Amino acid sequence: RTRAEAAGVLLAMGVLTLAGYLGLGLFATRLAARGFGPRHMYLAGWALNLAALVAIVLRIPGAPLWWCVYGFGAAANILAFTVLNEGFPSALAGRSNTAVNLTMFAGSFAAQWGIGVLADALRAAMALSTADGLRGAFVTVLVMVAAAFAWFLAGWKRYAAPPAVARA
């Protein structure tokens, strides 16, 4: 890939991420009124991320498309604030939102740094190319994301509140 092609993929991924945010903003209330609440939307976005990451790691043809799907699904991460608040009394909403915000920022930094460190370590230890080192690091990310997804699903019934029905 050339730099221009990579830039085009990043632009498309960014546009689709913004489209995901716009879609959540436009349709979340209507979907909640039909029983598809924030937890469901969060799950759907996470499932898209997971499916796209599997496709990327397995080198399923169409990598630019898979990165765009990944970006679109990532928009649902904003719903972590709403989903987390389902498990706390409303008086603690500020604290839980602050905690998830700090965790997201710190986790994003740690993940980006960790992917680079792991990719470099794999390259050095196994004489891999840069692409193969990154692929190995992304396999680790995939395993961690899949484990977190399974944990989220396991706690679904325990923490899920019925979606609030919007009044028209």
Residue ranges and their predicted role:
Residues 38-54:
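Structural signature of the two symmetry-related core transmembrane helices
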Residues 1-16, 132-139:
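Loop-to-transmembrane helix entry
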Residues 56-57, 138-168:
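Multi-pass alpha-helical transporter architecture, strongest
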Residues 21, 89-124:
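A late C-terminal transmembrane helix in Major Facilitator Superfamily
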Residues 76-89:
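Intracellular juxtamembrane helix-capping segments at the cytosolic ends
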Residues 21-36:
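Helix-to-loop junctions at the C-terminal end of transmembrane segments
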Residues 37, 117-143:
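A membrane-interface helix-boundary motif in multi-pass transporters
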Residues 62-79:
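Hydrophobic core of transmembrane alpha-helices in multi-pass small-molecule transporters
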